[in-house]
A protein has these predicted regions:
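Post-HExxH zinc-binding segment in Zn-dependent metallohydrolases
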Residues: 66-105
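Pan-zinc metallopeptidase signature
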Residues: 92, 99-135
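Active-site recognition of the HExxH zinc-binding catalytic motif
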Residues: 50-63, 74, 78
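Structured segments of extracytoplasmic/periplasmic soluble domains
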Residues: 59, 63, 83, 87, ...
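Short pre-active-site segment immediately N-terminal to the catalytic Zn-binding motif
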Residues: 31-52, 64-68
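Solvent-exposed, acidic/flexible segments
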Residues: 45-50, 70, 106-109, 113
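Auxiliary, metal-adjacent structural segments of Zn-dependent hydrolase domains
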Residues: 1-35, 42
């Protein structure tokens, strides 16, 4: 299946990953949770890892039942992407991707990322995670 069709989202550069979360409920308790992560094939290994990190951040939000507005969801998830690219300081791909993320005009993936990245720099991971539900 086409990843863009599956995600029902349009991005100028295309969709590189998507996460699906399904569950059943019995008396307000979630049971049988299922996560499915789709990732575009034939990517460079660093890009694959960055997309996987982004999608796993979505899983974190689902598992912890954290609801944020869309821009902050994608911004938070892009912190996983940022972490991967920063972990390859000698990679031209990582450097270029980080620059592109910093300039991204998209209100969710760009602006939301810059908001969350600034928060992370100011208060650190532990405090950011603890504060997520207040955004």
């Amino acid at each position: 299946r086409d990843l863009q069709e599956l995600s029902k989202t349009f991005l100028p550069d295309g969709i590189q990953g998507d996460t699906r979360y399904d569950y059943q409920k019995i008396r307000d308790k979630k049971i049988n949770e299922n996560f499915t992560i789709y990732i575009l094939s034939n990517q460079h290994e660093i890009n694959f890892r960055a997309v996987l990190a982004h999608e796993l951040m979505h899983v974190y939000l689902f598992v912890n039942n954290i609801s944020l507005r869309n821009s902050l969801v994608e911004g938070f998830c892009n912190l996983g992407t940022e972490h991967v690219y920063r972990s390859y300081p000698n990679s031209k791909i990582g450097q270029l991707k980080l620059k592109a993320m910093a300039k991204d005009k998209d209100p969710e993936y760009g602006k939301g990322y810059r908001i969350m990245s600034s928060e992370l720099k100011n208060i650190g991971w532990k405090n950011l995670i603890g504060k997520l539900e207040k955004y």
